[in-house]
Amino acid sequence: MTPDHGPLLYEGKAKRVFAADQPDCVLVEFKNDATAFNALKRAELEGKGRLNCQISARLFEMLEREGVPTHYLGLAAETWMLVQHVDVIPLEVVIRNVATGSLCQQTPIAAGTELSPALLDLYYKDDNLGDPLLSESRLQLLGLISSQQRLEIEQLARRVNQLLLSFFESLDLLLVDFKLELGLNGAGTLLVADEISPDTCRLWDHRNSDPQARILDKDRFRQDLGGVIEAYGEILKRVQGV
């Protein structure tokens, strides 16, 4: 079922954004498209949009219950959610609890190393530039956010990390790392935006010791491991069971 909506405002790799009847709101449709390596690798996976939409909804609801402001307002259909309109800050906030992926490729840190405190990195959100990592000096040079906003972003991201870590741990899942996107609503409030799903989180299954079988996230697509929909379905099953 497709909810009533206005014109298409934006289409990204994984979602479409439409105007909504409600003021200061938009409707987000989650697509079945899977992409990796800045969309150099692509596929369409039936059911992926529904899974990511439903998982994101449950996680946004959990964060809201814990007092974390998000753009989420409610589900509009299986693959649609109603959210507050926000001015997205062009940064990807990445929090790493365990070393893996690009961190191990760029540093001598061994894969699997627990990072305490968690490592927080900011990346400039621009596919054409390859989403480069920003140093503090480059962040100031670009003038994307103020020093106060930088502090607020880090505090919010670390709070989200604590909540997600505990939540996933209760489901026998390890939150290895994840990406957050943030935005400002009309009142200037900093909100968690975009989505929180296996597309944006690395999640390992504590119930499985096999280094490949334990992967329940987008790395199954990146690494051609197969079983992407089954893995995402397992995440939704556990999240809904809480």
From Swiss-Prot:
Recorded hits in SUPFAM superfamilies, A to Z, give: SAICAR synthase-like (SSF56104)
Catalysis: reaction(s): 5-amino-1-(5-phospho-D-ribosyl)imidazole-4-carboxylate + L-aspartate + ATP = (2S)-2-[5-amino-1-(5-phospho-beta-D-ribosyl)imidazole-4-carboxamido]succinate + ADP + phosphate + 2 H(+)
Q: InterPro entries recorded for this chain? A: SAICAR_synt/ADE2_N (IPR028923), SAICAR_synt_PurC (IPR033934), SAICAR_synth (IPR001636), SAICAR_synthetase (IPR050089), SAICAR_synthetase_CS (IPR018236)
Cite a single GO MF annotation: phosphoribosylaminoimidazolesuccinocarboxamide synthase activity
Q: Which UniProt keywords apply?
A: ATP-binding, Ligase, Nucleotide-binding, Purine biosynthesis
> What cystine pairs are annotated?
none
**Pfam families tied to this protein:** SAICAR_synt (PF01259)
Q: Which EC number applies?
A: 6.3.2.6
The record's section on PROSITE patterns has: SAICAR_SYNTHETASE_1
- Pathway note: Purine metabolism; IMP biosynthesis via de novo pathway; 5-amino-1-(5-phospho-D-ribosyl)imidazole-4-carboxamide from 5-amino-1-(5-phospho-D-ribosyl)imidazole-4-carboxylate: step 1/2
- Any one Gene Ontology BP term: cobalamin biosynthetic process
> What family does this chain come from, according to its entry?
Belongs to the SAICAR synthetase family.
Fetch the NCBIfam families from UniProt.
Answer: purC
What is the protein name stated in its UniProt record? Phosphoribosylaminoimidazole-succinocarboxamide synthase
Organism, by scientific name, is Prochlorococcus marinus (strain MIT 9303)
